[in-house]
């Protein structure tokens, strides 16, 4: 493979310790492969051998931008924290889906049920995504930790770059012209409530809070000249520093020149006419009427205000691409010489492969029944072959690489089996599944007395919740973790486990790849003999690996028989354990538990930014308790009850009753009833999926049938 020679990226690696164990050899082999032009390599690294540190050393040595692809938000957040520590002076960013909840638009022909798109957007993750692209177009020392959402459409990088506003101290420009430029970047003017993505004007001073930054800009004018440019704290207005030169990037990823919208409307009208003719020739009059009404409404919205609900379905005409063309994604923002690391590739690669087929199947149904124009099919994730073309030089990283990775690398792997700490793979014990809960409870109590932690994997979410509740009733501090918790809640829960706020965590499929929990000395796998996806050889090896960071580690498989998957997982664990013991004996190494500080995670960073946003908003006019304000809370209460969030509805009710006694007073003078969402620890968490949050779309839900 020919390598595009570009200027080296100035990475500054913070090395808390030198590479050891198998790391030096693995680092050298990977660097040699990249520099010799190898298209693909595989790093077979056992759990706890420092694969992340190996990746960081490779990035620092080859001095090229890097993408770290992860299969879930929890692991991506952990990797982000680690790379931030390794590269404190470089641009390390976090790019995952910004949806806390997402119900895609769909139609079920068998029942004639149309489901409108419904979503809840996490504003903090949106900020982090925008920070990612702003760094990619402005510098080369960039490491992006991303999830599979990186293969979805993101807007044109060329349009993004063309709309960047370049400001210089002493530059001649009219104030109104500058304000129009900010509007073109999709920033909104709000002189009262200052928040992310907004700007305000105070005399000859313009203050703008970029959608991708934690600080704001103040641009001071003297007539038609930019006299001073400052970075300021949004909360207090205090100047951080002054600069002579400033780039302001678009507020959103989907931006385009105004003439592009008019051209797209013309193309959409032509496509609508063609599709209506097809429906009418087939006798599909209902579908034709449905498509005509919906599309004409959307086109009117586009013409008048520049956007419409579901505008992403018109992304191909708006981008000016040909039908069937590959959409622009995060990969198109990278320079040509970037390198890709696919972490836990045995899980991540199948995710990438599956995305396109599932998306297309759903959208074909919408097009065939008149809910969308055919151009909606081009609003899609990358096909697998398109993804392969865009990843450049790639390194698959896994303790259990699959056949695909081995085929790409011709069966060659770079092994990393020896841990720098001398830790061994854990001993595996098989215990009868009969009476497994009673036996496990006793084991958890033993670990709790030693200030150690326990991970338990169950087969279903319901079982995980019930087991956590039962353990709590028995006096054991226990929580559950599964997909109904959002990305920040999951990370927060794992940090609380490490900090000792509870002793046992029960999960389903999230307690596997990559989780770095040195305090865990016992991993218990319930119903290990139930052959299937959650109890396959790969799944068992990955789950066993969660106990590989503690010198007292042990794994218990609860089973009444030994399946083929169990036997292969036990054999592989024992093979690695023998290699590790021989290495330790040869070099006189005594295994010792890893001691890691509990780092400030991305959830803490997001929470701090959210608090600064709130303070900046509160610094404007004081909020007074009015009848309208109380009425709004009552509407929230009713909506929460409809979504089955009864605990939140009860808290809102108490708050409404409290505030009715203080009409006319400033809100800041009244002690507010706590309104945090329930469900993080032991509760059922039902009803969370439909919860509307700030940034949620206004999609209509299917009404629930009334009980007779």
Curated annotation (Swiss-Prot):
Where found, per UniProt? Cytoplasm
> Pfam families, from UniProt?
Helicase_C, ResIII, UVR, UvrB, UvrB_inter
Q: Signal peptide span per the entry?
A: none
Primary place of residence? Answer: cytoplasm
Keywords linked to the UniProt accession: ATP-binding, Cytoplasm, DNA damage, DNA excision, DNA repair, Excision nuclease, Nucleotide-binding, SOS response
**Keyword flag DNA repair:** yes
Basic residues: bias regions? 683-708
Entry binding sites for ATP: 45-52
What domain notes does the record hold?
A: The beta-hairpin motif is involved in DNA binding.
Quaternary context: Forms a heterotetramer with UvrA during the search for lesions. Interacts with UvrC in an incision complex.
Report the sequence similarity comment from the record. Answer: Belongs to the UvrB family.
- Designated name of the protein: UvrABC system protein B
- Natural source organism: Rhodopirellula baltica (strain DSM 10527 / NCIMB 13988 / SH1)
Gene encoding it?
uvrB
């Amino acid at each position: 493979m020919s390598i595009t020679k570009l200027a080296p990226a100035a990475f500054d690696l913070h090395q808390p310790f030198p590479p050891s164990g198998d790391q030096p050899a693995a680092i050298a082999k990977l660097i040699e492969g990249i520099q010799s032009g190898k298209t693909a390599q595989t790093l077979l690294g056992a759990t706890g051998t420092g694969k992340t540190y190996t990746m960081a050393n490779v990035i620092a040595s080859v001095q090229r931008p890097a993408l770290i692809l992860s299969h879930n938000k929890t692991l991506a957040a952990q990797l982000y924290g680690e790379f931030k520590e390794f590269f404190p002076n470089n641009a390390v960013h976090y790019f995952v889906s910004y949806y806390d909840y997402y119900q895609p638009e769909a139609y079920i022909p068998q029942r004639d049920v149309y489901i409108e798109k419904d979503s809840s957007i996490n504003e903090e993750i949106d900020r982090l995504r925008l920070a990612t692209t702003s760094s990619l177009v402005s510098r080369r020392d960039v490491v992006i930790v991303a999830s599979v959402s990186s293969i979805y459409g993101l807007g044109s990088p060329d349009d993004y770059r063309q709309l960047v506003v370049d400001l210089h101290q002493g530059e001649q420009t009219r104030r109104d012209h500058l304000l129009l430029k900010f509007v073109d970047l999709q920033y909104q003017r709000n002189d009262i409530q200052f928040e992310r993505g907004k700007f305000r004007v105070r005399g000859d001073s313009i203050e703008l809070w970029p959608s991708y930054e934690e600080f704001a800009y103040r641009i001071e004018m003297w007539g038609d000249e930019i006299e001073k440019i400052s970075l300021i704290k949004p909360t207090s207005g205090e100047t951080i520093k002054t600069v002579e030169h400033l780039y302001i990037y678009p507020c959103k990823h989907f931006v385009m020149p105004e003439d592009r919208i008019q051209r797209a409307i013309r193309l959409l009208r032509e496509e609508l006419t063609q599709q209506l003719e097809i429906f009418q020739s087939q006798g599909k009059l209902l579908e034709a009427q449905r498509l005509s009404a919906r599309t004409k409404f959307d086109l009117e919205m586009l013409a008048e205000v520049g956007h419409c609900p579901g505008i992403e379905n018109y992304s191909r005409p708006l981008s000016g691409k040909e039908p069937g063309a590959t959409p622009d994604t995060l990969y198109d923002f990278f320079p040509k010489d970037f390198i890709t690391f696919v972490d836990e590739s045995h899980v991540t690669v199948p995710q990438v492969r599956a995305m396109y087929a599932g998306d297309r199947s759903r959208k074909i149904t919408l097009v065939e029944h008149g809910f969308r124009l055919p151009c909606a099919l081009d609003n899609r994730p990358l096909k697998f072959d398109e993804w392969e073309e865009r990843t450049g030089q790639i390194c698959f990283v896994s303790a259990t690489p699959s056949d695909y990775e081995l085929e790409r690398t011709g069966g060659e792997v770079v092994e990393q089996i020896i841990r720098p700490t001398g830790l061994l793979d854990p001993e595996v014990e098989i215990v009868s599944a009969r009476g497994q809960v009673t036996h496990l409870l006793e084991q958890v109590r033993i670990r709790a007395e030693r200030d150690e932690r326990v991970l338990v994997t169950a087969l279903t979410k319901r079982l995980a919740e019930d087991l956590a509740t039962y353990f709590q009733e028995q006096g054991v501090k226990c929580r559950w973790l599964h997909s109904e918790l959002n990305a920040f809640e999951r990370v927060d829960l794992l940090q609380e486990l490490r900090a000792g706020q509870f002793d046992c965590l029960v999960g389903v499929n999230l307690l596997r790849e990559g989780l770095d929990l040195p305090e865990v000395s016992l991993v218990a796998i319930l119903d290990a003999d139930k052959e299937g996806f959650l109890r396959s050889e790969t799944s068992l090896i990955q789950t066993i690996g969660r106990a590989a960071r503690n010198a007292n580690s042990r794994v218990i498989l609860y089973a009444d028989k030994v399946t083929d998957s169990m036997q292969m997982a036990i054999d592989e664990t024992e093979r690695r354990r023998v290699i590790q013991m021989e290495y330790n004996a040869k070099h006189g190494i005594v295994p010792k538990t890893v001691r890691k500080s509990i780092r400030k995670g991305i959830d803490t960073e997001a929470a701090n930014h959210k608090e600064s946003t709130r303070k900046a908003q509160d610094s404007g006019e004081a909020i007074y308790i009015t009848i309208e304000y109380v009425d709004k809370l009552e509407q929230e209460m009713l909506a929460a009850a409809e979504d089955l969030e009864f605990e939140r509805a009860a808290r809102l009710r108490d708050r409404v009753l409290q505030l009715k006694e203080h009409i006319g007073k400033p809100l800041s003078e009244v002690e507010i009833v706590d309104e945090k969402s329930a469900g993080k620890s032991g509760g059922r968490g039902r009803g969370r999926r439909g919860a509307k949050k700030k940034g949620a779309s206004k999609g209509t839900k299917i009404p629930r049938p009334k009980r007779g």
